[in-house]
A protein has these predicted regions:
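Hydrophobic helical membrane-anchoring modules
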Residues: 151-202
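Conserved nucleotide-sugar donor-binding catalytic segment
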Residues: 32, 88-165, 169, 173
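The conserved acidic donor/metal-binding loop of glycosyltransferases
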Residues: 43-47, 71
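Conserved donor sugar-nucleotide recognition element shared by glycan-biosynthetic enzymes
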Residues: 23, 27, 52, 106
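Acidic donor-binding segment of Leloir-type glycosyltransferases
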Residues: 1-16
C-alpha cells in the first residue's frame, strides 16, 4: 500500500525499521528524517478530515503558532461514532495540560523551525503526554482550533482502551518524568480525573 502511494506522490518517503523500537523511537526517527517545516502525527487506525492539514496550518501561519491541536471524535473499532465532538480550549499552558490532557496526538501539528529538535521521551506508554509537557515546559503554549478534524479509533485491548493502565501512566509521568511533588501531583491528578470523566459524559 505504501509503495502505491509513493508512486503517486514523491513527497511520501517511507522509513522501514528492522525491529520494533516502540512508538517514541519510531516517531523520533520519522521526525529526524523529515525535511518539511511541519510535523503531524497519524496512527494507522485513525482518520483525518481531508482538509485538516490545510485548515490547521493556515491557522498556525496566520497566528505564528508553534504547537497546535484540534477537536476530534472517538470512533469504535468498526468506525461508528462513540461520542459527541471533543471540544478543545483555545490555549493550553504547561500547568493547564498537567490537569487536563485533552490534546489528541492525532490532532497535533508542530512547527519544527520553532520547536527545534526536541525528542519524544523513550518510555513505554504516554509518550505523547510526556512530549507535549516537554514542549510546554520549554516555554511554548499550545493553541486549539475548536473544530473536529480527526477521528480517534479505540481498538480493543489497546493502551487507550485500558483505563486503569492509562491512570497509572499519567501518575508515572507526574512523578517520574516531570518530578512533581506528591501534593501537586495529587492536585493535578484530581483535575485529570474530573476532565477525563467530563470528556466521557459530554
Amino acid at each position: 500500500i505504501i509503495n502505491i502511494f509513493c508512486e503517486k506522490d514523491d513527497r511520501i518517503k517511507p522509513v522501514f525499521l528492522e525491529k520494533n523500537i516502540g512508538p517514541s523511537g519510531a516517531r523520533n526517527i520519522a521526525m529526524q528524517k523529515s525535511s518539511g517545516r511541519y510535523i503531524a502525527f497519524l496512527d494507522s487506525d485513525d482518520v483525518w478530515d481531508p482538509y485538516k492539514l490545510e485548515k490547521q496550518i493556515s491557522f498556525m501561519e496566520y497566528n505564528n503558532i508553534a504547537f497546535s491541536y484540534t477537536g476530534y471524535q472517538v470512533i469504535s473499532e468498526d468506525g461508528n461514532i462513540r461520542n459527541s465532538i471533543i471540544k478543545v480550549p483555545a490555549l493550553i499552558t504547561y500547568h493547564d495540560y498537567l490537569k487536563n490532557t485533552i490534546i489528541g496526538c492525532l490532532t497535533v501539528i508542530l512547527d519544527k523551525t520553532q520547536i527545534g529538535d526536541l525528542k519524544m521521551p523513550d518510555i513505554r506508554t504516554s509518550q505523547d503526554m510526556a512530549f507535549w509537557l516537554l514542549i510546554l515546559r520549554n516555554g511554548f503554549s499550545a493553541y486549539g482550533l475548536n473544530e473536529s478534524l480527526a477521528k480517534y479509533r479505540v481498538v480493543r485491548d489497546s493502551n487507550s482502551s485500558n483505563k486503569i493502565r492509562a491512570v497509572k501512566d499519567v501518575w508515572f509521568v507526574y512523578r517520574e518524568i516531570e518530578r512533581l511533588n506528591l501534593f501537586y501531583s495529587l492536585w493535578c491528578f484530581i483535575n485529570y480525573i474530573f476532565y477525563a470523566l467530563k470528556k466521557r459524559i459530554l
